[in-house]
Amino acid sequence: MYEEIFNQIRSAANKRNLKDSTIHAYCTSVAHFLNHTAKDIDALTTDDVDIFLTEKKLSGISPETYNHYHSGIRFFYKKILKKNWDDDDIPRMKRDRKLPTVLTKTEISAILDATPNLKHKAMIATMYSGGLRVSEVTHLHYDDISRTKKTIHIRDGKSRSDRYTLLADQTLEILTEYWFQCGRPRGILFPSSWTGDYLTKDSVIQFFRESAKRAGIQKHVSTHCLRHSFASHLFESGCDVKYIQALLGHRDPKSTEVYLHVSNKTLLGIRSPFDEMGGE
């Protein structure tokens, strides 16, 4: 019904190098909005957006879901319809700031010890070693691991910006054991045993939570806790914040357009917190 509109959204989004998942989310949000308004495209106004988003807010949806709708419809109005859009009139929903869950080094060690599956153990170690997202660890390839430079190459991450992050000695040992015992994969580093393709994020989240439960961790944990813990432990060890931001692939807080990158030479001077697991 709205295929021509979706094609325009895809074309405009691709020109801006947006990820496929973002484009899909934009199209879904716009479809919900258009079905709700049931108006001709030419007759749409920002009042229609305000009514739609207000109803969504009153329905009790989360700030994250609300802002997904907001982003998709905003893109549609500004880039496709070429209509004026004032963020002061149609603001995003503010999210409650919650402190991320950070695991201690002892807790991370316990989780690793409670993970009998060698592939799963290698993935958990890799996520903590370099602060990887789940989507990043599942898409690693054999060639992304540098034994000599002790780095992990993250390709096309969430921000569509390649980066290098840290490979701890302990992680390299686990990866080496996994590689020799699990078929010496040369393509995808952690392929699905069933399909040979990339593992799903849900499967990684599930086995991590099972390992945390076996380890007796009482905190509410997710795989993202490993990323938070990586950053927190580096900061505690005195690592410069700008290097932590670069290792995580975050944008510079002073500019949403510029990324901070760390050279391989600089990486050689930073130790992964996994290499400090000898004590708290």
Language-model features and meaning:
Residues M1-E280:
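Conserved catalytic core of the tyrosine transesterase superfamily
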